[in-house]
Curated annotation (Swiss-Prot):
It comes from Corynebacterium glutamicum (strain ATCC 13032 / DSM 20300 / JCM 1318 / BCRC 11384 / CCUG 27702 / LMG 3730 / NBRC 12168 / NCIMB 10025 / NRRL B-2784 / 534). Signal peptide: none annotated. This is Ferric nitrobindin-like protein. InterPro entries: Calycin (IPR012674), Nb(III)_bact/plant (IPR022939), Nitrobindin (IPR045165), THAP4-like_heme-bd (IPR014878). Residues 1-54 are annotated as: Disordered. Disulfide bonds: none annotated. Pfam families: THAP4_heme-bd.
Length: 229
């Protein structure tokens, strides 16, 4: 396995000139955010991810209204819990530029971590799915100093450790401290940064930037709507 590290010059990425920027994630008032969330939850509050139901431990839940209570240590990550689905754009060394669909699941089981799963599929020029793209899974943790740890595994042969912090109540920035690529993994994947944030529409936006040469360049970004939770 090969390892890369990230330079210590953090960059706050945006979602692009054609859409809301993640730097706008704190621009909505608290009361407006609550009202918007209440309206949107009318179609998502009754849904949850499936569980086996016969385990001697709690099933994962992506709906804060169901299952075990969220651990007190995760309150700074609470807005992420749910299932999010939408579309994004990629510009990678492996596959060039393309559009993709994505579903992200943030779930918990009452313990002091969030589980994370991302599934992606490529889209053609008409927006039709053409096949499976990338998958990721991992865990988010945050300590009493609001320091976030994100362990992320990629199905394509990458394991990464990110550290970061909340930028505000609706945005979270992460920087890769270790990017390990297997012998069959993407040798061109450099270290990078990610920013996740709730837009004024309460959609979840995220941006992944990677080191190319001496500069960080956008690799992937997406705008996702809550479908569960």
């Amino acid at each position: 396995m090969s390892e890369n590290s990230t330079p210590n010059n953090p960059v706050v990425p945006g979602a692009g000139a054609d859409g809301p920027s993640l730097s706008d994630s704190a621009s909505i008032s608290g009361s407006d955010a609550v009202n918007l969330a209440a309206e949107q939850s009318k179609s998502t509050a009754h849904r949850n991810i499936p569980g086996l139901g016969d385990l001697p431990i709690p099933d994962d839940t992506a709906n804060l209204r169901e299952g075990p209570n969220l651990h007190d240590g995760l309150l700074a990550l609470l807005p992420l819990v749910g299932v999010w689905r939408g579309e994004g754009q990629a510009d990678t060394a492996e596959d060039g530029q393309y559009a993709f669909g994505q579903q992200i699941t943030f779930a918990h089981d009452g313990e002091n971590y969030l589980s994370f799963e991302s599934r992606m599929w490529k889209l053609d020029e008409e927006g039709n799915p053409t096949g499976v793209d990338q998958r990721e899974s991992g865990f988010w943790r945050i300590n009493l100093k609001d320091e976030i740890e994100f362990v992320c595994t990629h199905a394509g042969g990458v394991v990464e450790i990110y550290y970061g912090q909340p930028l505000n109540e609706r945005a979270w920035q992460l920087e890769s401290a270790s990017t390990m690529v297997t012998a069959t993994g993407p040798s061109t994947l450099g270290p990078g940064k990610r920013l996740y944030g709730l837009l004024p529409t309460n959609e979840l936006g995220w941006v992944d930037e990677r080191l190319v040469g001496d500069a960080l360049k956008p690799r992937m970004s997406a705008q996702l709507t809550r479908v569960i939770g």
